[in-house]
Amino acid sequence: MANRYRKIAFVFALLVCGFAAQCVTAQTAYQPSPENLQARREFQDMKFGMFIHWGVYSVLGDGEWVFHNRKLKVDEYNRLPLFFDPEKFDARTWVSLAKAAGMKYITITSRHHDGFAMFDSKVSDWNIVQRTPYKKDPLKMLAEECRRQGIKLFFYYSQLDWHNPDYYPRGATDWKNGRPDHGDWNAYLDNYMDGQLTELLTNYGPIGGIWFDGMWDKPDADWHLDKTYALIHKLQPAALIIPNHHQTPRPGEDVQTFERDLPGQNTAGFNTNYVSNQLPLESCDTLNDNWGFNIGDSNYKSAADLESRLVRAAGNNSNLLMNIGPYPNGEIDPQFVTRLQAVGEWLSKYGESIYGTRGGPIAPGNWGVTTQKDNKVYVHVLNWSAPLLALPPVAGKVTSAQMLVGGATTEFTQNANGVILKLPAASKDEIDRVIVLTMAKAGA
């Protein structure tokens, strides 16, 4: 397999290096293209996405880190694809669920830390088409269905690889799994990884971008980021680079993402406290406790919890990327389905205050958040039982206040000290009372 890889990798190196060499110097002083800037704005407008962790690890029903957590040998893990045959996978069902949930984009694992490509890769035979009885490319089907239904598709790609011998020197997650104690790091990055990225960016039509993960395994290594980022922006200028490295954004990156956290809060303990005011923001989390399918994980977030998380993300000027881990047969857990459909029903009423908005003029608090769009400020009251809510001063004159749902007028007072709203009582099961403040337009 290694010899076969090196022969194929050499061919890819010629193709990949030719693209990237022209751009490496310029990438350090990255100037996003007009298409890229437009894609960033569209990304911010979408607000809600579906994250999907799905791979051969799903067969064991023990999460996406099972290779590492059980300390399996490479030779043992190599048997796993033989049992992966997702005969119930249906791209239309998956994309339709995302759409019903009010999600505007999907980010799916093209390969996770086990290095197994969930697409038809010619760089290595360690992929779903050549190693499983399924013999098909689900990402191709998903890409086609996303285009049909108007959903943007992003590819998650793990930079960390527990399977490839050239991922060397090994990182913080290393264990003795049977790989040799040597490897070619440059070949791994420039030939293997960039070769697969080239496939993803050329064989699946226009995509939303690449969502990177795993650089935290070797945070001080030279990942050849300038070269890889230049390659991506060369092949698809509008594709967004979204790195989950938990660090301050670097040149060439287009979105700052936070894992299991809202921007800047770092309750998870491994995210950066720095929040970019130049890049779109994203918060990712998972609908239960695991990213990949775990048969023993029934700790599902409620629909109300998901709605609250989406509102708080939007109020922090961030998207929410909510994960599901499908079954190995390709079906989606009914518990995920019912909750996501409920969120979609909620968004059919409240979506105006989420989609296309930016973080509002009032800092988020325990009581709730604000979002804004054009001359509207949406006050999302999430946790406040008193009849009056005092808000700090806002720039401009409030001309009216009304409930988003139902349109009832809301009494308010505005003075130099701020805005006081007289809140209607929350109705049963109402997790978010949204008051729309209409602001006087400049010059009016």
Language-model features and meaning:
Residues 10-20:
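Bacterial N-terminal signal peptides
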Residues 26-444:
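Mature catalytic domains of secreted/periplasmic carbohydrate-active enzymes
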Residues 1-12:
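Bacterial N-terminal signal peptides that target proteins for export
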Residues 23:
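Cationic, low-complexity basic patches in intrinsically disordered or flexible, solvent-exposed regions
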